[in-house]
Amino acid sequence: MSSAITALTPNQVNDELNKMQAFIRKEAEEKAKEIQLKADQEYEIEKTNIVRNETNNIDGNFKSKLKKAMLSQQITKSTIANKMRLKVLSAREQSLDGIFEETKEKLSGIANNRDEYKPILQSLIVEALLKLLEPKAIVKALERDVDLIESMKDDIMREYGEKAQRAPLEEIVISNDYLNKDLVSGGVVVSNASDKIEINNTLEERLKLLSEEALPAIRLELYGPSKTRKFFD
């Protein structure tokens, strides 16, 4: 008989993942400040060098040379500004990608904490079953999680029955086709008996979905609206 555990709702599972989003926001703010400061410094240095070089080149034909120098300076400044803008945009994307990658690596810490991971895993399985709504489900997991899932079967069936009501679940089969531990740190992939319908509820997939949903808002909050964008959703 398995011991009863406190199952998390899908919202509570999202709360756990949203903690990662808070971490992402904090890290991205710091990265954005560093990137902008560095870009401003590089811009001012390069602009100063250009002004100095152009001024030194002015000879007796002062007015003509000055006019040409100012035009050249304006063109060069515009080129530099565009180059710096592209550099900042590239650095921002790289920093956000790096932060999401760091957060992804921290997922293994959640899966290694059995007390924290167990209710999350049960909720991920139940959530996938509720999306599937099939009488028989095949659960693919990491090999190390098989015994844990076996111990939760009764709790999973009971919670599913309470929530699904008119779509009874007759059997849960734990597949011996295990998830790749090098690609997945936790969670499950659940499919129907024919394996034609599949629900990916791994921790990585949930973080990916969360990141895709959060990224536009994070960009807007950290960097402000795009000056070239005329319309917003």
Swiss-Prot record:
Family that this chain belongs to: Belongs to the V-ATPase E subunit family.
Effect on the protein upon substituting K230A: Increases ATPase activity 1.3-fold
Protein name: V-type proton ATPase subunit E
Disulfide bonding pattern of the chain: none
GO biological process, one term: vacuolar acidification
Effect in UniProt of substituting S2A: Reduces ATPase activity by 11%
Database matches in HAMAP family: ATP_synth_E_arch
Resulting phenotype, D145G: In VMA4-1; is rapidly degraded at 37 degrees Celsius
Domain of life: Eukaryota
Function: Subunit of the V1 complex of vacuolar(H+)-ATPase (V-ATPase), a multisubunit enzyme composed of a peripheral complex (V1) that hydrolyzes ATP and a membrane integral complex (V0) that translocates protons. V-ATPase is responsible for acidifying and maintaining the pH of intracellular compartments.
